[in-house]
Amino acid sequence: KGMAILGAHIDSPRLDIKQNPLYEDTELAYLDTHYYGGIKKYQWVTLPLAIHGVIAKKDGTIVDVCIGEDENDPVFCVTDLLIHLAGENMEKKANKVIEGEALDILVGSRPLKGAEKEAVSKQILSILKEKYDMEEEDFLSAELEVVPAGKSRESGLDASMIMAYGQDDRVCAYTSLVAMLEVENTEYTTCCLLVDKEEIGSVGATGMRS
């Protein structure tokens, strides 16, 4: 009787795209986001970002989305002020320099030819239609997440470390799973629990509290 249990969480801080996200401001197109998990908001500005997720279209089909990971893909960013315009911001505490509502991602600046109003937003919609056969209403049934773009890399001259998004807590998730699969002659049944929602309090049907 008994069980040997290993546990880790597999969710990481990120930006989630809202359900009605596309808007235009000063001839620039943005996607409205809200942050998920415990993030240092000032670290997310002027950082190359990628969009991952799925779009559930009205006809029931599912479209996988991954923009920003291939070297030929465009990337996205959260904008920031130039240093000589940011004097007031630089005097704020770190948790106030960038507010959560300022973490919207810049997605375009080129207007659609012939469009009179919100021409940049319309250009973005035309690209989404061309590449993903996506309408603006499809954002309502999409799950799209924004994360730092780029693959994991070895770090240090001795390559003794790994630099990558999401090491908290996937480094523990990977080692826990491998340990369970490779252990021999165990006294107890082995179990590995990999859960999400830890970043927001372990709530929900797939969090540890369930």
Residue ranges and their predicted role:
Residues 1-210:
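N-terminal hydrophobic/helix-forming segments and targeting peptides
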